Amino acid sequence: PYDKMKFSTPKTLSEIAAMIGAEKYVGPADFPVTGINEIHSVTHGDIVFVDHPKYYDKALRSAASVVLIDKDVECPEGKALIVTDDPFRDFNKITHTFCPFVPSTAMIAPDAKIGRGTLIQPGVFIGNDVEIGQDCVLHAGVIVCDGTRIGDRVIVNPGTVIGGDAFYYKHRPQGYDRLLSSGNVVIRDDVEIGSLCTIDRGVSAPTTIGEGTKIDNHVHIGHDTVIGKECLIAAQCGIAGCNHIEDKAVSYTHLRAHETCA
């Protein structure tokens, strides 16, 4: 399993606060923290950040154990708070500390796991900590970024990029800040992906393509999206981040999906 969002050993509230230079936290100093996650994917033990009033209640009521927030609020029972002037910046600090970018040293990373019978055509790049199943075909020029998981009998056509960073930015007076990505892409068995497609990794959870789904050329799938089993996605569809497409859905050419689809 790929679980960069979970710390290798639990941390404490005071340790995380010190790491990001936060002077104020609410809760016991030894309150346990086990990972980080974006608001759409949080689980018990996680830190979630929130820096917009629209999402304060959602974050405070979420499954997250620690809320990194830019406002003094009442701490919900069973949770802890870290209060800073810039939760976005500080969430990036945590991500960078526990999920740093590791440059590749070869076209196929030494720790990549490639199953029996899988064919890798010339010019394919396979990043760190990638797992590819049996009897797959990766055609020329395919890029498989760090942490990607690919099942059995998957076909990926030329020029497709799997696992690029999420398109997630915060606007500031001086420009845009990118939210660092610590998620990955999971492609289930018997998926086929056309040429020149792009599938972004999740911000802090997997972007998932379900078993048996077929994707045409020139399709973009945004971060943290979950596509069900046996879907058909035609050429030039654009699916934004955090969408959920149910099993056996058919998406026709030029579809633009901006929010949860079923």
State where each predicted segment sits.
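Single conserved hydrophobic/aromatic residue that forms the stacking wall/gate
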Residues: 254-262
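Short, small-residue-enriched loops and turns at beta-alpha junctions
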Residues: 177, 205-206
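Short coil/loop residues immediately preceding or within conserved phosphate-binding loops
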Residues: 182, 204
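A generic local secondary-structure boundary/capping motif
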Residues: 145-146, 175-176, 183
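Short helix-capping/hinge SLiMs at alpha-helix to coil transitions
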Residues: 6, 127-128
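Inter-heme linker and motif-flanking segments adjacent to c-type heme-binding CXXCH motifs
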Residues: 201
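A structural motif detector for beta-strand N-caps
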Residues: 106, 112, 117-120, 124, ...
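Terminal amphipathic alpha-helical/low-complexity segments used for targeting or macromolecular assembly
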Residues: 1-105, 110-111, 117, 153, ...
